[in-house]
Amino acid sequence: MYPHHGAAKIVEIADRPFRGQVEPHLRLEVAITQLQIWIPVSKIGADEGQVPVRKVIDDEQLKEVKKCLREEFVEEPTNWSRRYKANNEKLDSGEVMKVAQVVRDLWRRDQDKGLSAGEKRMLAKARQVLESEWALARGITEEAAAGEVEKVLSTKKD
């Protein structure tokens, strides 16, 4: 998984120049767009300035995502810019639970009050990232994953 782009497959590992030295790089291909991304292996990680690339979630984590999506609306800052910034930070993290929170909260806000154009774009992007991972985790198409996500969002908490 690659933040902001969703599910990606490692298609090549090769030595490439980076900051004056030759280093091993991963070439990722994003599932939805076939976008090619080269990342120096040394830049992969969870620290500041690194790219948080990770494995696709397993069945247990998928259950937690479903649970998160069913939770009630969580009160967010009323100030649009603060809410947008907080949601953007969650998306930047690349953590599936934070992406699921953004999808849940923006989807619920859209059902209740509607969204600004910027938040609509953010919801679409967050859903794309979540649904691409969901599809890989379940071994289904992204269209089927989108339907499952919508169904879970529409279901009240157990």
Where are these regions (language model features)?
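Charge/polar-rich, low-complexity and marginally structured segments
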Residues: I44-D158
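A positional/architectural concept
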Residues: M1-Q50
